[in-house]
Amino acid sequence: MNQDEQKRAAAHAAIQHIPAGCIVGVGTGSTANYFIDALAGIRSRIDGAVASSEATARRLSAHGIEVMDLNNVDELPLYVDGADEITPHLHMIKGGGGALTREKIVAAVAKKFICIADQSKLVDVLGKFPLPVEVIPMARGHVAREIVRLGGQPMLRQGFTTDNGNVILDVHALQILNPIELETELNQITGIVTNGLFARRPADLLLLGDEGGIRTIAI
C-alpha cells in the first residue's frame, strides 16, 4: 500500500472501535479526513461528533453528521485523530494542520484516544517534524526568544491564523528525548496557548497502516 492507502486503511480500521449510539471526537488533517469519510457510512449508528477544527466541522456536516458543541456533551467515549509523528510509547507531535489547541482539548475530554497513521509517522524520537506552538500574537517575539533559549529554532507559519485567532511558531532543531518534560516546560512560557506535544495525554491505541495491512500498538 502507498501512503494514502495506508492512511485510508487505518481510518477504516478505527470504525470498528466506535460503540453504537456514541458521540465521537474527530481530529483534523488528511488522515482524519479519511476517517470522516468512513464515518459517514455509519452515521445512523452514532449520535453525532465533536469537531477539533472548523474545517473538520464543515466536512462532517457535508456528510450529514451532526456536529455538537463540546460544552453540551457530558461524555465523550472516543477521539480519533492522526499524528505528524508518534513513538512506540504513543507520544505524538500534532498540529501540522494548525488545530493543536482544540485537538488537545477534545483529547483531554475523551475516555479513549485512537491515533490513526501511516507507517512514515512512527519514529523512535520526536522532533524531526517541526513542533507547532500556538502563540498569542502580541507574545510572538517573547515566546520565540524563550524557545531559542531552549535550543529550538522557531519560524512563524506565514499567512496562517488558527481558529482561535492566534499564530503558529513551528520549532525546528529539537531532539525531544523527554516529551512530557518539554511539553510542560513550553506551556509555562507566558504567551503560549499550547504546544503540539501530546505526551502528558498520549494516545491509548495506534492503528498503523503499513505495506502488510494494519499494525496495532497499545500502551
UniProtKB/Swiss-Prot annotation:
It catalyses: aldehydo-D-ribose 5-phosphate = D-ribulose 5-phosphate. Its EC number is 5.3.1.6. The keyword Isomerase applies. One of its GO terms (molecular function) is ribose-5-phosphate isomerase activity. Keywords: Isomerase. Pathway: Carbohydrate degradation; pentose phosphate pathway; D-ribose 5-phosphate from D-ribulose 5-phosphate (non-oxidative stage): step 1/1. InterPro entries: NagB/RpiA_transferase-like, Ribose5P_isomerase_typA_subgr, Ribose5P_isomerase_type_A. The keyword Zinc-finger does not apply. GO terms for biological process: D-ribose metabolic process; pentose-phosphate shunt, non-oxidative branch. Pfam families: Rib_5-P_isom_A. It comes from the Bacteria. The active site is at 103 (proton acceptor). Substrate binds at residues 28-31, 81-84, 94-97, 121. GO terms for cellular component: cytosol. Catalyzes the reversible conversion of ribose-5-phosphate to ribulose 5-phosphate. PANTHER family: RIBOSE-5-PHOSPHATE ISOMERASE (PTHR11934:SF0). Homodimer. Belongs to the ribose 5-phosphate isomerase family. This is Ribose-5-phosphate isomerase A. It comes from Nitrosospira multiformis (strain ATCC 25196 / NCIMB 11849 / C 71).
